[in-house]
């Protein structure tokens, strides 16, 4: 049987076939709900870890292990289940992950010992990773993936902000485990919502596609490298401010400005994401981040530091949805998007470590130069994709 000719999208990268209809609004909303569930702990990690440290009398090291268990397990499970999940219905994958998230979070009501809590947070992370697989695949198969990921990011930030504000109240009135109960309550509708997860290809067809073509490797490497730069810059933003002789209050103003710029950029991307190609959006985000780290590198006063922080965050927020949108075009099954998300998380974690030798040799002022080189390298990997077939 002859298959239909491939459609062309994003300057030459092969798009899904005409028989693979994009998912609709219900699948979009289901994917957004899944993304919020999967990232809920990460959104409130600093406040949550502080609460656990004070209420359960944990050490800072123990709190760090809990954070690593939760977020690390989500990243590893997402990457590990990306390909195997292609053999099952997407709704089944979503339900399995949701059940694990529900059980692990509710079980936190029954424990106080560090070992038991560590095991439950590890299990919750695995569940969140499985949910991530389902929701990223659902979002990547939307007719405008960049716009879908931007909408999901905006809702994630809104939910995280609300929960961060609520945690002190919940802790004061209902105890330290109340936050996990809220997360479980928000996740519970996922058992019903899972019916709206739609895969644009049959499970076996999705599982059989080659995720890592040359274009897939290049996109994965570019996203991972870019997030090394992002992680290194963000982790050392305070040090760069001190290098510019700014006070803690001034640095806080810059961080607040950047925190506002992120949602603004995400909202704008959600509005225009369907009108701009992934490659063009990636290019704009990359160039904007390059401008931001350049300003931070030359910042000798507060105005330049403020501008650099805001511009960098704006570019970062634009870059992410378009990067995931590009992986969706390269691999319509969504598996590459899941693995690329894990690569981005890994790069963000490795970035501060990569910056350590440069800081030891040349001081914190070397970070913007390192970030510039990494972002430029990532951009160099993206540019050839306009001539590449997936």
Where in this protein do the model-derived segments appear?
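Conserved MFS/SLC helix-loop-helix module at the cytosolic interface between two early adjacent transmembrane helices
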Residues: 76-113
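Helix-loop-helix hairpin linking two adjacent transmembrane segments in secondary transporters
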Residues: 142, 151-199
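Paired small-residue
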Residues: 104, 115-124, 303-311
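Extracytoplasmic gate region of multi-pass secondary transporters
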Residues: 45-46, 216-256
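A late C-terminal transmembrane helix in Major Facilitator Superfamily
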Residues: 330-365, 371
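C-terminal transmembrane helical hairpin of 12-TM major facilitator-type secondary transporters
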Residues: 277-323
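Cytoplasmic helix-loop-helix junction between adjacent transmembrane helices
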Residues: 120-154
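Helix-to-loop junctions at the C-terminal end of transmembrane segments
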Residues: 77-90, 265-278, 359
